[in-house]
Amino acid sequence: MVAIVDYNMGNLASVFNACKLIGVDAHIVSNPDELKNYGRVILPGVGAFGDAMEHLESTGMKKAVLDFAASGKPIIGICLGMQLLFESSEEFGDHKGLGLIPGKVIAFDKSKMNMEEHKVPHVGWNKLFNKPSPLFNTLTNPYLYFVHSFHAVTDNKYIIGRTHYGYDFTSAVNKDNIYGFQPHPEKSHDNGIQILKNFMEI
């Protein structure tokens, strides 16, 4: 069974429907005590980093997610959910994250971008240049759907995917049993569905 974490910040319905499409027994979970009963966790998210961390803390879900990650079972963060995996974010101030992957979340550096060609937020289809990973089984450099104004900065050893938007940025990460994915697989048609299928087999 797969738990989709509900902390009042997620694109829950679309992630749930994508799981249902591939025949996965997924449940939207808001009770942190239940998380340990699942085999995999999806941490979705849409919105501001600081608000998301506040919700995770206030609901008790932060500790539940950290405990789940420590158990060694697979967990994936999607979009804002991926950013929460890192140590900190500079979005609207300085905020601490879950600290599951070393690194931080920063705004797109507009000084490196042609702003006539590259608007922020980064919205739409773009190519993810992937390294070999179980998450990308059968896929090579897939086009996926993005919506974000911030991106992660981390050590190269954790990066399994990069995307170019004015400059190269980190769009997929992996550390042990923990995966992060900046684009939205649930909005990325066949390529995104394949990535969700691959996660279910990890």
Name these PLM-found stretches:
Residues 47-122:
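Cysteine-nucleophile active-site neighborhood
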Residues 21-28, 56-59, 125-131, 162-164:
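Short gly/ser/thr-rich secondary-structure transition/capping motifs
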Residues 151-202:
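C-terminal and late-domain segments of enzyme folds
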Residues 1, 26-37:
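Short acidic low-complexity segments
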Residues 42-44:
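Structural motif
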Residues 2-24, 185-187:
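N-terminal beta1-alpha1 ligand-phosphate binding loop
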Residues 89-167:
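Pocket-forming structural segment of enzyme catalytic cores
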